[in-house]
């Protein structure tokens, strides 16, 4: 390791070093670090400081957004700097989707980070105090609540990875001073000064005006973000209690929800819609959920789409349904032929079904025979085993309270036009027929099908 003492001369620099080492030592011993480096001053300083503190534990990644002609050259600059420091280096090109350029570039960048992060590896980024203050101010102007105003956390544990921002308490002036002291080379991205972008406009035009009037604004806004993080943590604890009382991540009881105050209802719905995502819905989107779905008639089947999920009311429940489940892309084959074998697992639209022995079920003579499976056509009747008489299959489905968005997955198993049973999302319904017998077999719905799957739709 190079001598680090000369890099940490001033009191605040020594304090930074002590804080970083303390945070590193608090992590599991096997923890390693992937540094996101753009080649700019902030990330190049971070690169040098981390190379002083734990060179044997770091890798470096440069994301080439391919938005500027010189982006490849910047990547080669970072590669050369890493080679001089003997640090492993990755360059990853990404395609930025159409839309808001800042948001889409950020999304592509984080997807690339997640792709390269290894087990026990923490992503390290160079956001600093002014970045934090700018983020809070921009979110305030966009109408964010407590969660949004909490801005960036120093340690951010996400679903897929953990993110560490060691420079978050350093001012822009401190970073410039330290980079000059260490003779850190860096590139200059001119888009950082392009006021067509909100953040650059804020930094170049709005920030100087406010700073002249409020010299301590940067520190004050940074402090506010920490206070908002405290408030957000307390709010999260309350929301977890409310969620447990009202339902789950996929369903809320409207009766239980309506026992809460309006403020807690609104916060719970916002938290619930966010799910495992990073961002909450807008205030207007939550209000639409109230007016268009919760306030709709029970039989209206109103649905609200946001961020890949559909939000629907079914009777006195509110459901969060993935788009793939609500709007299936693969049509169900009209008629398929299936051969059932004991222990075999079959993949159907209604779920995975395993052929298992049953005290009462279908005759073993049907095993290995060709059976037919088809979707509902409408008007079918079923004589459920153990019940008296036949009744409309539609009524049986309604009585079982199978969700409307799942009913298209229901299929009928038959032999020579004799109904043997019905595959439903709740399980297999055995039909009374000449093929029913003691010591038979039935398809059993499996919640964790690990057996070999026979796709009946192929």
Segments predicted by a language model, with ranges:
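Internal, active-site/partner-interface "lid" segment
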Residues: 192-200, 218-229
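Proline-centered helix-kink/hinge sites
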Residues: 88, 166, 208, 215, ...
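Core alpha/beta nucleotide-donor-binding catalytic domains of modification enzymes
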Residues: 2-208
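Conserved anion/nucleotide-ligand pocket segment
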Residues: 205, 209-221
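AMP-forming adenylation/ATP pyrophosphatase catalytic core
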Residues: 2, 8, 12-39, 59, ...
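Residue-level recognition of alpha-helical structural elements
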Residues: 101, 217-220, 300-302
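PAPS/PAP-binding and catalytic site of the sulfotransferase fold
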Residues: 178, 202-210, 264-275
